[in-house]
């Protein structure tokens, strides 16, 4: 039996689970009931389940194959977002202010479907398949924390995962090699000037003016310090300074993010930003410091894993379902798994204008065409089977 033969059989199963999870969202590091539900369903299939009992969130399922061999992990993230849903569907979130607005409900359903398929094809599995249901992806720290849970990560030899993607038409899948999602880092800039009277600016060092100059000068990091052939996004998302209408503030704080694909350029990018921040402030008689926090590295598919994934998509769904898609600037903590293990991260098309599945991820109207999710389940299952068969 081939995974493609099970797509229709589990179509409703996967769709129903996606809608169940959509109705019952839980935020990052709060996925207690979600974890219990997943564990119960996997155990009902006969999957070996290991829950992170210390935290009560996240679990590893293990499917032991009919023959000995290596181990591969299939991963799904399980957290929702603090978003008030504005959809009117009958599976709308039942929890006020919480919503699966990024598609992780679909990821869980896809992996449950893959588990069902794998359990019915155990004779084809030459090794072990680990099912990694990871909490807290939205924090950026979910994967590093989950890697520390037990010894599952040490035991696997490769990993595969994916993200439903609203910019890709439903039914298409993209698995190209190389950078697929950007590194995501947080920057905080603290400016210190000199507070003064609003009528006497010459006796003060205006932190707002200094901050404004820093923001403007930072634009040259991208336009004049980075090659036009490289990709860097530098965004300042907030500025906080002052509280009175007639007082020149002496302090300001700014927050932002940088996104990039080449990890070898990270140090250069950070130092370029630091130089602009510090010297701009100095030119105005102020001081400024840069705090840099690395959230996730870039998600980079290795060539061999992507080549296998392309073959699997064509073999399972047909050549017309394999799509090419440009890399994207959002970050994904799946990247942490790829630091030490070979793997591939797929984009799974869910866009369908006929059902208004066109709103962007994190939007309060986000939705997906979930009729195509069982096809993704088949790709997950078949990738695991074929990877194990080719790496005896």
Model-identified regions with their sequence ranges:
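Acidic/His- and Gly-rich active-site-bordering loop/insert found
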Residues: 1-100, 109-125
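Hydrophobic face of alpha-helices
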Residues: 14, 28, 32-39, 111, ...
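Divalent metal-coordination and catalytic microenvironments
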Residues: 21, 61, 74, 104, ...
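A structural signal for isolated positions on well-ordered beta-strands in alpha/beta enzyme cores
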Residues: 50, 130-132, 289
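Histidine/acidic-residue-rich, glycine-tolerant segments that coordinate divalent metal ions
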Residues: 59, 81-83, 87-99, 105-106, ...
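Hydrophobic beta-strand positions in extracellular immunoglobulin-like domains
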Residues: 63, 191-193, 258
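Non-cysteine beta-strand/loop elements that form the S-adenosyl-L-methionine
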Residues: 73-75, 84, 187, 345-350
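Metal-dependent amide/peptide-bond hydrolase catalytic core
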Residues: 212-392
């Amino acid at each position: 039996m081939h995974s493609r033969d099970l797509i229709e059989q589990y179509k409703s199963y996967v769709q129903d689970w996606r809608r169940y999870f959509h109705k019952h969202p839980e935020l990052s590091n709060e996925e207690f009931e979600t974890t219990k539900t997943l564990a119960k369903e996997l155990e009902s299939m006969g999957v070996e389940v290991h829950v992170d009992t210390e935290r009560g969130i996240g679990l590893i399922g293990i499917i032991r194959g009919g023959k000995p061999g290596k181990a591969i992990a299939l991963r799904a993230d399980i957290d929702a977002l603090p978003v008030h849903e504005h959809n009117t569907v009958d599976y709308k979130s039942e929890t006020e202010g919480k919503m699966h607005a990024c598609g992780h409900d679909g990821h869980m359903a896809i992996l449950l479907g893959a588990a069902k398929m794998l359990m019915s094809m155990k004779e084809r599995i030459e090794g072990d398949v680990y099912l990694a249901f990871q909490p807290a992806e939205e924090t950026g720290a979910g994967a590093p924390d989950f890697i520390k849970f037990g010894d599952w990560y040490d035991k696997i030899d490769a990993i595969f995962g994916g993200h439903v993607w609203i910019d890709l038409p439903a039914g298409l899948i993209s698995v190209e090699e190389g950078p697929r999602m950007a590194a995501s880092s947080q920057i905080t800039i603290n400016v210190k000037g000199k507070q003064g009277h609003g009528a006497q600016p010459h006796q003060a060092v205006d932190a707002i003016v200094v901050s404004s100059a820093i923001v403007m000068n930072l634009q040259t990091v991208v336009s004049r310090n980075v090659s036009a052939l490289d990709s860097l996004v530098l965004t300042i998302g907030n500025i906080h300074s002052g509280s009175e209408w007639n007082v020149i503030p002496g302090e300001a704080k700014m927050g932002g993010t940088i996104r990039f694909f080449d990890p070898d350029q990270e140090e250069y990018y950070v130092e370029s930003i630091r130089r602009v921040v510090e010297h701009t402030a100095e030119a105005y008689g102020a001081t400024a410091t840069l705090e840099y926090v690395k959230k996730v590295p870039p998600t980079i598919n290795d060539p061999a894993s992507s080549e296998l994934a392309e073959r699997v998509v064509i073999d399972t769904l047909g050549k017309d379902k394999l799509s090419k898609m440009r890399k994207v600037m959002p970050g994904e903590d799946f990247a942490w798994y790829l630091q030490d293990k070979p793997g591939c991260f797929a984009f799974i098309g869910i866009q369908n204008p006929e059902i208004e599945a066109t709103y962007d991820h994190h939007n309060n109207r986000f939705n997906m065409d979930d009729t195509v999710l069982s096809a993704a389940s088949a790709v997950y299952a078949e990738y695991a089977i074929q990877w194990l068969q080719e790496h005896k």
